[in-house]
Structures are given as structure tokens and as C-alpha cells.
């Protein structure tokens, strides 16, 4: 990242951050390096089918929606956790997939000044010194065998829309390089295990977790009323099971509308979220107070599907030369872990090519 224009501070910071405003130029520079090294990048080339050898045992490339085919001795499948069409494609091609745990919930938003005051032990009315960065936090608990935790906390950040289809509302968080928004936000999520999606399994099989996510996302879209407006609720109202009569200012630009999130989310998610919020508020007075607001839904924390691979070769056990990789394959949970898994898969592929 640094070699392609990211701030050098990320090499030593405990919580490295590039900034969503700087990232496009970094990615552009990475793309240009790939091209200079002899690589090719094909935009608008959606893969619809895997090409196989005559005996069907080995991949020999990919076929795209526009009719183009790219032949290769190996395919590294690193499509991210929101490319749901890839899962359906693999199933149609007869490949085995597995369910895995994931997490769903909401974004919780506080004034950044509130987080600063707690983390830096400031006196009432005292502002954070300019020399200190916007403060961050992490909270976690286990409630009846399920994790309840913050996720992807964004100090001085924004809540942003992250849907991939028109009938969804999905929220995520981001921060610019300076982290100077007056808001702090974080995912606040509960673990979902395969057995929690049983009601979707009869119709959707191994994609039951995907269907579970999709049901929440379309419900959030209906609750928001369209145009990517999101359902929201003050935390005290969520805890008491009532609709908020008014909402707080927010960093979410498309807008928010009052809605009972305790009715939108599954009951087993709601009561664990409530228990977690009360627990964290006991340790950190105000965490679940009048300045805290929930915006839904946060559903894309990780993939609900794992694409199996051999522990040694990292190839899919049902198709030689296919290397499932990263978050979409279920082997990573963030930027750095996905990058490390990509490197691991590239090394395994290189070893096979040199054998």
C-alpha cells in the first residue's frame, strides 16, 4: 500500500488506516503496476461459467457473460463476500460449498466527542487535544453461546450505503484520512451459526445464510421507504421496544427514518443485542444513552459460505486448479487477512506451476 501512495504511518500504527478519500488513487496505482508487469484487467467481464478439461477434473479457464472465454491452467477465485452470483454459479457447476458462521446487526453511532471523552478521560466540556487522533473503541461479550461485538469501528467517520442490489439497504462504515467527522460509528453485531438459519435451509440449502442476509436487507429497504434511506432507532427506544418519535443527527447521507428495529431483526438477535448494550453501558455509562443511535442493517461482516479447499494445495477438492481465496471463499475477515490469504494462494499456485 505504501509503495503505491498510502501514508507511511500505516507501517507502524497499531490500527493502520489509509482513508477512503485516498484509497482510489492507491488502487489505481496498484492497477497500473499490474499492467506494467504484464497483467491484464478486464472490466465488465462477469464470469458465468468455469471451463473444464475433457475429463471434468481440472479447470481450464472461465467463460464470461459477454461470450468471451479466458483459458488458463489455474483460476484463483477471489471475488469478495458480496458476489452472491458466484456461489450460485459454483453450485450450478456441481461444486461443493459449506455454510459457515457470520454476524448481523446494525451500525451504532455516537458523537465522536463522547467517545473521545471516555477514552481520553477528558473533563466535561474539554475537547480532545489536536495532537491526539479521534478515539476508537472495541467491545465484545458472549451471550448464550453467541458473540456480541463491535465490528469495523470508524472514529471520525461516516455510515455509508453498501447494497449490491436495488431492493436492499445495507450499511457499512468508513473514515476519511483525517478522521474529522463529528461522528463515531461501529458495527454492532451478533454471531449467526448455521443452525440459526434452519428456516431458510429447506428452500435455499447451503445458501441459507445468504437468504437470511437477503431477507434482512430487503426488509430494511422496505422500512426505509426507498432511495437508500435506512431504518433507525435511538438506543434507549430500542431497549424499551418503542419507535423513536424523533431521530438524532447522523453521518448517513441518504437519510434515516424512524422504525422499530426490534421488530425488523430476528428475536434471537434483538435480545442478545439488548443484553450486550446493557452490559457495555454498565461499564461505559452512556454507551446505550440518549446520544446513541442505531441504523440498520449491518449484514456483510463476512461470508456466510465457505468454498472448500485442500489444506495443503489450497485447491478445491472437486476441481483441480481452482483456488478459492479471501473473504468470499470464507478464509479471511478483513483487508489484511484477505491480502495474506491471497499471498498464500499465490504461493501455492506458483509451487504447483513449478512442480
What are these regions (language model features)?
Residues 1-355:
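Residues forming the flavin
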Amino acid at each position: 500500500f505504501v509503495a503505491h501512495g498510502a501514508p507511511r504511518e500505516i507501517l507502524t500504527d497499531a490500527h493502520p488506516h489509509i482513508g477512503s478519500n485516498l484509497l482510489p488513487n492507491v488502487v489505481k496505482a496498484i492497477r497500473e503496476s499490474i499492467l506494467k508487469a504484464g497483467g491484464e484487467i478486464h472490466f465488465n467481464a462477469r464470469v458465468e461459467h468455469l471451463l473444464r478439461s475433457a475429463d471434468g477434473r481440472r479447470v481450464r479457464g472461465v467463460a464470461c457473460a459477454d461470450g468471451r472465454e479466458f483459458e488458463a491452467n489455474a483460476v484463483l477465485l477471489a471475488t469478495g463476500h458480496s458476489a452472491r452470483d458466484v456461489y450460485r454459479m459454483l453450485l450450478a457447476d456441481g461444486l461443493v460449498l459449506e455454510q459457515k458462521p457470520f454476524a448481523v446487526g446494525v451500525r451504532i453511532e455516537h458523537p465522536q466527542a463522547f467517545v473521545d471523552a471516555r477514552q481520553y478521560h477528558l473533563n466535561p466540556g474539554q475537547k480532545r487535544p489536536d495532537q491526539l487522533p479521534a478515539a476508537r473503541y472495541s467491545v465484545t461479550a458472549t451471550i448464550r453461546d453467541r458473540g456480541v461485538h463491535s465490528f469495523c469501528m470508524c472514529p471520525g467517520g461516516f455510515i455509508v450505503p453498501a447494497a449490491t442490489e436495488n431492493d436492499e439497504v445495507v450499511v457499512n462504515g468508513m473514515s476519511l484520512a483525517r478522521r474529522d467527522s463529528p461522528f463515531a460509528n461501529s458495527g454492532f453485531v451478533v454471531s449467526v451459526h448455521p443452525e440459526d438459519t434452519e428456516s431458510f435451509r429447506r428452500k435455499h440449502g447451503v445458501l441459507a445464510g445468504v437468504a437470511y442476509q437477503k431477507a434482512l436487507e430487503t426488509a430494511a429497504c422496505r422500512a426505509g421507504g426507498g432511495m437508500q434511506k435506512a431504518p433507525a432507532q435511538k438506543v434507549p427506544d430500542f431497549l424499551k421496544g418503542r419507535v423513536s418519535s424523533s431521530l438524532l443527527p447522523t453521518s448517513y447521507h441518504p437519510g434515516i427514518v424512524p422504525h422499530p428495529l426490534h421488530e425488523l431483526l430476528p428475536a434471537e438477535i434483538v435480545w442478545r443485542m439488548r443484553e450486550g448494550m446493557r452490559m457495555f453501558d454498565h461499564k461505559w455509562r452512556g454507551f446505550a444513552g440518549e446520544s446513541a443511535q442505531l441504523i440498520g442493517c449491518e449484514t456483510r461482516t463476512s461470508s456466510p459460505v465457505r468454498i472448500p479447499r485442500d489444506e495443503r494445495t489450497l485447491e478445491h477438492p472437486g476441481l483441480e486448479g481452482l483456488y478459492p481465496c479471501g473473504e468470499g471463499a470464507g478464509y479471511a475477515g478483513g483487508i489484511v487477512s484477505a491480502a495474506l490469504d491471497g499471498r498464500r494462494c499465490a504461493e501455492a499456485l506458483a509451487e504447483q506451476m513449478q512442480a
